[in-house]
Amino acid sequence: MECNPPSELEQQHWSAIESLRDVESDATWDHVIALRKVGTSSVLERSLAWCTDPDPYRRSIGVSVLAQLGDDGNRYPEEATSMIRSMIGTESDHEVITSLISAVHFRGLSEGVPWLTSLALHPSENIRWRVAWALPIPNTLHPGTDRSTLDTLLRLCADPEPRVRDWATFSLSLTDEDSPQIREALLTRLNDSDFDTRSEAAVGLANRKEERGIEPLVGYLKSDRVGELFVEAAEIYADPRLKPALVALQKWWDINPDLLARAIAACS
């Protein structure tokens, strides 16, 4: 691969990243995103070099740039994915692992899914959250989907960390897979202490027309905190038992009047 010398602007971005030394800062990510968009062969070359650097900060940045190169996020697929594959089996630094999880997700590496599922019990809640976010949503239209993906999501939706449960429940609510185990998991999450997780569970149960989800949903629609997902779940259920609570919401709920009107019509 012929590599052109880096431009002055590229050099400025790399130098700024070196100076900031903070992989979580917005300023660092402004430079990472800029380098991704530039997406030249010189950006690729520097990213690949940083991926093999002894410094975990550099490795994390290198992987983060490789994750989405070019305007379409998929430039230099062979070079980028080859490096990502070589790293997932050996990397031990937590920050680099989180960057690798994102790279596996954005590059759509199906061979990286077993590695993702292996991280579901990782002691770092940030890594478990990234796994819940990155796992492909199981779909019966794609029978090649690893069965372990669904099992991992079921495990993560019972994670002690709320944001992990939220993402895992979100994925379960969207999958077209259905089973008693999935329904029981969603019913459990419908009573979760976390508001967002409860909301995602309500939609998942509505998508499956699960009768046991209706009574709790009525209660949530009558509460003083009603999110759009609860109203969306009511629209999906289209059950007359939900209509009185929806009609009562017209007195004060102004988040999405059109959605509320559709839900009332569906339940009429």
PLM ranges: what are they?
Residues S25-A34, L48-A49, P56-D71, T98-A103, ...:
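Non-membrane alpha-helical segments in proteins
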Residues D30, R46, I61, M83, ...:
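Alpha-solenoid helical repeat scaffolds
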Residues L121-P123, I127-R130, A134, H142:
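Extended amphipathic alpha-helical coiled-coil/heptad-repeat regions
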Residues V247-S268:
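Eukaryotic acidic, Ser/Thr-rich intrinsically disordered low-complexity regions
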Residues C3-I17, V38-T52, D72-G89, L109-L121, ...:
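Amphipathic alpha-helical scaffolding segments comprising HEAT/armadillo-like alpha-solenoid repeats
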